[in-house]
């Protein structure tokens, strides 16, 4: 069941090419999230943009006890809404509705998985990679971008044994 929460920005890491990784504290939402799900996000402090924007959950943040305490979003600054996320400072608040969408389902027993992504399309696979590794699945990520600035965060996949192919 989705929840509507006000998430607090803990950090905002800028990446090349106008990308950023936003870490949000929202334990009630994070504890319900599964690989492949997304949230609808809107700035709490303003009416523009009027509509929420969908963002795949990039990663789950865990506290010292291993409980999900928040999540990260992968963002590319393009318009007003993504610009607000890109400029967000620690302590900023965003309205988040989620988790939404059907999580990834794994065939039983999966032997091999291929993931194909480019740019921010990488986000849902960051939570899938450890789930695949935990089931002993050999995974390959085919990843592309328009420029070298669109290739990032590959370090999130290597610890899980994911073979990365840059297209």
Question: What do the PLM-derived regions correspond to, one by one?
Answer:
Residues 2-90:
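Ferredoxin-reductase
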Residues 80-167:
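FNR/FR-type flavoprotein reductase catalytic core
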